[in-house]
Amino acid sequence: MNAPDLTRPPLTIRRISLDTGRENVAVISRRSRALRPEVFRGFSRVELRINSKVLLATLMITDDDAMIGPDEVGLSEPAFRRFNEPVGSAVSVTPARSPASLDAVRAKIQGHTLSAAEITAIVDDLAHFRYSDMEIAAFLISAARFTTTDELLALVGAMASVGTKLTWDTPIVVDKHCIGGIPGNRTTMIVVPIVAAHGLMIPKTSSRAITSPAGTADTMELLARVDLDVEQMKQVVHACGGCLVWGGHVNLSPADDILISVERPLSLDTPEQMVASIMSKKLAAGSTRLLIDFPVGPSAKVTNANEAMRLRKLFEFVGDHFGISVEVVTTDGRQPIGRGIGPVLEARDVMAVLGNEPGAPADLREKSLRLAAHLLEYDPKLRGGTGYARAKELLDSGAALKKMQQIIDAQGPSPCPAELGSYAADVLAAADGVVNGIDCLRINRLARSAGAPVAKGAGIDLFKKIGDRVEKGEPLYRVYASDRSEFDLALAAAQAESGFAINHHTPADVDLVS
């Protein structure tokens, strides 16, 4: 039986300045001349249609005639962009029935294992915005309880197949990924030009910050455009051997971005979901060789060697299945890498390393060289064990800086150059001693409270690291902000709890990359 019409005659589209995240929302007046409450009662979603174009949206009712007139349907910003029809267009609105794939979600909630076909149907509906946030959360929570290896493989394959899938005309396409959680750590922007300068292809797509003070895309955006489409990205890669672009604009594994938007507020980050997220994007990007950086530390995502081992085996298992050679390295995750935390400060550190400046952060330089060495040794013409020497040669000679400038020129000038925030103050040591620990989560939160990454010039500039001796009253770091209220908030929080542990015990040395 067909669903009855919700509107007669059609309503006209009105754009509402309402950011509803990734969810499509349609708003209708309670006094709509076309609205029949007895028809839509029991339906929380509606289908909007113009000819063959269809949009599913969550239905909301308003009593505010100034917001929506009786002959209009209002579309939130995400819904308006996706429907892509002019304001004033006539649109039919009918009740939308739940996607059939929700039956599989209910089965998963009840403890059943899903087939590949069921998972493919769920991912397809997710990617086409047929699920509400509540329905997405139900799927994520049910999958967090248990996910079999067969389900994981099906999920990775389905997520990679929806959206853009890149192919390249070379058998070796290298990539790197860090699972995150460490402030600074902007190694990708150094590794990519080193590897591309050597001659290996490295088409790098990166994310914007979700819970951190800066993502690679946020930082690179200060130097060049990152919102390239697929064809523009390919042109840059063919010209330069590599790129540094925002993955969200290339539409790789779009279902993953939707899942992440719901995972974060729920603090869901299971190993299986992490692997599905990363590997689906790498599969869609056409990568054949993948290096994954696991920072290990007390406030990192991976806190010990046992966790790292289990996660490594999961990545390698999925990589083997899809023909991607995966190498995992564990790195020092006890503290930030580099000095700057926040887009402007991190871009400064990157260019200082590439430019071989005397004051460039030594830890950022060394970690980048060692990660690049692993990738360079995928080149069959390079003898095993010589990757580090080659990476250092490319950095020291200026070849990596030259390649970075070529990539910047090819991607186009930055649309948003920025300066450091105009408000600044130092956070001081509360006692004499040795820096014995730095809480990465705390430092991340402080930098975000200062306004990063939205305010590009906000963040934290570190003066001390683990093992450094300090005196009471000596600066540990400087807080920058572009807004007075954010500055006051961040500074007060930092003075109350700096994130630094200072005592008289000298911490043990930990290898930067192992």
UniProtKB/Swiss-Prot annotation:
Q: Does the record's keyword annotation contain Phosphoprotein?
A: no
What's its EC? Answer: 2.4.2.4
Q: Which domain of life is it from?
A: Bacteria
GO process annotations (BP) = pyrimidine nucleobase metabolic process; pyrimidine nucleoside metabolic process
Provide the reaction this enzyme catalyses. thymidine + phosphate = 2-deoxy-alpha-D-ribose 1-phosphate + thymine
User: One GO MF term, please?
Assistant: 1,4-alpha-oligoglucan phosphorylase activity
Query: A GO CC term?
Result: cytosol
Q: Which residues form the signal peptide?
A: none
Q: What class of enzyme is it?
A: transferase
Q: Which HAMAP family match?
A: Thymid_phosp_2
Which family does the similarity line name?
Belongs to the thymidine/pyrimidine-nucleoside phosphorylase family. Type 2 subfamily.
Q: What is this protein called?
A: Putative thymidine phosphorylase
